[in-house]
Amino acid sequence: EGRVAGAGLDVFAKEPCTASPLFAFDNVVVTPHLGASTHEAQDKAGLAVARSVKLALQGEFVPDAVNVQAGGVVAEEVRPLLPLAEKLGRVFTAVAGGVAPSVTVEVRGEVVAHDVSVLTLAAMKGLFTTVVAEQVTYVNAPLLAADRGVQVGLSTATETLDHPVLVTLRGALLDGRTVTVSGTALTGPRESLRLTGLDDFDLELEAEGVLLFFRYVDRPGVVGTVGTLLGEAGVNIAAMQVAR
């Protein structure tokens, strides 16, 4: 009926398959069923599928998913940056007070020797997570951006000053403001996601839990007042940083 643009098949009801009406279609590719031909291979294939399903249900990136724009193998050096880019997107939207019409994802460091385009998907997922009612995934994030006319670009450079790898989200808002959020991913014993910059302020803050950002007049007593108000409201402060 012409409803399917193309298909690839390697599993058939009866194998080996030597005759099928599907062979007549130019837009259908058929191959012998070579994978998972042993019990051990079938077990590993089942585990791989189960892991992918778990990732999808958790809203995380699924490698090799056919309906993900940046699908495929993600380098081990890039994987830790996926949750970082997503968190930066969430912080960006919170600080901006909404989604910016255009955002650039800047990636710096030797990691750009690998394909880092998947980080734009992670950033979009974070940008829209708190502004739409539906669940935001790596699949629908680009669609949400397109529907709202939001453009998300990618910029890469090998040079970075203070960190081996740095990811920055930069965007201009409709009111003329520019919002910039930067972060890095620490590996090894101190493995964590860190916020390193917000607009013109340098930070060194773990990107976990509930984050509060305040802009106030630089004068004595303000930090104490903020701490007192939060304490009276029953809010426990795990860490605090002041930047100028």
Residue ranges and their predicted role:
Residues 67-244:
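A conserved regulatory-domain signal marking ACT and ACT-like small-molecule sensing domains
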